[in-house]
């Protein structure tokens, strides 16, 4: 009988300690916990910048400073893959550094000159404002999802990345096909996608 009383006391004490430990978990003081990412080092999604009909991809023609850019069919290396490094946001939207995955160099107006007809080339990161770009949706698909984008320079948002006759240039945005870009994921982006409702 004494043993049974000791067991009861031990169980009661254990239950009280367990309640004292769990009780703070169930109190609500009006504070809502914020959700955060599990990992902050999740790899950035690489993108392909495709022309309007998605037949060619913006590709770096080299890996050194001053390398030209052109539209080419997709190859087997990372010269056509781009990473969008967020720099900040303001009244015009969010702006990025567009980093080539093969070289680590940025989309840059030649000599940092942001003016009409300036060539756009690759150059190392200098944290110049002319190396910052807004990627702005301009047309949607039939479901209302953003489809075509213009890529305009931070220093002059009227100047867009434009396919010129011999490479990429800055030109006044007019909405022509050579200024419209598709943002296509380079590889697996997620688990969802369009499906046929057949």
Label each region the model flagged:
Residues 1-7:
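N-terminal secretory signal peptides that target proteins for export/translocation
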Residues 30-198:
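Lectin-like carbohydrate-binding module/patch detector with strong preference for beta-trefoil
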Residues 9-28:
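Sec-dependent N-terminal signal peptides of Gram-positive bacterial secreted proteins and lipoproteins
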